[in-house]
Amino acid sequence: MYNYLDFEKPVADLEGQILELKKLAQEQGSVEMGDEISRLEKRSADALKDIYRKLTPWQKAQIARHPDRPHCLEYIDRLFTEFTPLAGDRKFANDEALQAGFGRFNGTPVAIIGQEKGSDTKTRLKHNFGSARPEGYRKAVRIMEMADRFQLPLITFVDTAGAYPGVSAEERGQAEAIARSTAECLKLRVPVISIIIGEGGSGGAIAIAVANRVYMLEHSIYSVISPEGAASILWHDSTRAKDAASNMRITAQDLFDLKIIDGIIPEPLGGAHRGKESVIDATGDIIAASLRSMKDIDGETLKQERRQKFLEIGRNI
């Protein structure tokens, strides 16, 4: 069974009944329950469609954070061959929250950077829940510089609530590391494609998302601050995150309307976790199309178009 979100309770109840009936039918060797199971399956599918047809921004935020959602390493494993990760920032340490390296996409050598949240307690702690430290962003800069030197397209996967805000990170220059990574993105003379696959939070996200083409999964979110953080600032009450989300325009649909992103990648009904392979493959199709569209554009033009793109965002919102 799936991990159900609170607003999915009607579906959870129905799918629980379906599983019980299937188990009972198997134990009794009965085929008489087939009609009842089919009826409940239709009710469950209809309920899921009804819920996902009218999702609120806060509900989309919860889907973006779903623990079973496909994460960066799953995209890398399925979309790229010969992936070779690089470790360390040549200054302090390696940061497992930020994955980076080189591989082949449909046979083409590319550079890859992404934030990894982890999928269970052990890996979440290992990857610091996707919140990168300064050494993570400095590692990203290493990869960007190498991509530019060897003229390799850069593909990034964004999935973070934000950069790690701890004292140790601040002592090691978190703000400088984020700023430098953002600036490095703007200097690259290669195609840069960024996919927001879950949460895109604050400077921790934008540091690897200043791209020629930016796409979001259908139920991902992208904002300068989390709904909880905004609620704490505006109303001194983080429990009003739902109200904040409704006013922040954090959804893929809002950001496409604002011309901040270039497109939306559809998710299976019920979210990406209900069809991981299909949504990863759809992401691969978008990456392939984007690379084709930039194949004949020279490096200086790519750089200037990217800079202009983000200047326009600042002027228009």
Swiss-Prot record:
GO biological processes: fatty acid biosynthetic process; malonyl-CoA biosynthetic process
Signal peptide coordinates: none
Catalytic activity: N(6)-carboxybiotinyl-L-lysyl-[protein] + acetyl-CoA = N(6)-biotinyl-L-lysyl-[protein] + malonyl-CoA
Subcellular location: Cytoplasm
Subunit-level organization: Acetyl-CoA carboxylase is a heterohexamer composed of biotin carboxyl carrier protein (AccB), biotin carboxylase (AccC) and two subunits each of ACCase subunit alpha (AccA) and ACCase subunit beta (AccD).
Family, similarity comment: Belongs to the AccA family.
Pathway: Lipid metabolism; malonyl-CoA biosynthesis; malonyl-CoA from acetyl-CoA: step 1/1
One Gene Ontology cellular component: acetyl-CoA carboxylase complex
Gene3D superfamilies tied to this protein: 2-enoyl-CoA Hydratase, Chain A, domain 1 (3.90.226.10)
Organism field: Brucella ovis (strain ATCC 25840 / 63/290 / NCTC 10512)
UniProt KW keywords: ATP-binding, Cytoplasm, Fatty acid biosynthesis, Fatty acid metabolism, Lipid biosynthesis, Lipid metabolism, Nucleotide-binding, Transferase
InterPro entries with a match to the protein in the record: Acetyl_CoA_COase_a_su, ClpP/crotonase-like_dom_sf, COA_CT_C
UniProt keyword annotation of Lipid metabolism present: yes
The enzyme's E.C. designation: 2.1.3.15
Gene giving rise to this polypeptide: accA
Molecular function in Gene Ontology: acetyl-CoA carboxylase activity; ATP binding; carboxyl- or carbamoyltransferase activity
Keyword DNA damage carried by entry: no
Occurrences of domain CoA carboxyltransferase C-terminal (ranges): 40-293
NCBIfam families (alphabetical): accA, AccA_sub, PRK05724.1
Name of the protein in question: Acetyl-coenzyme A carboxylase carboxyl transferase subunit alpha
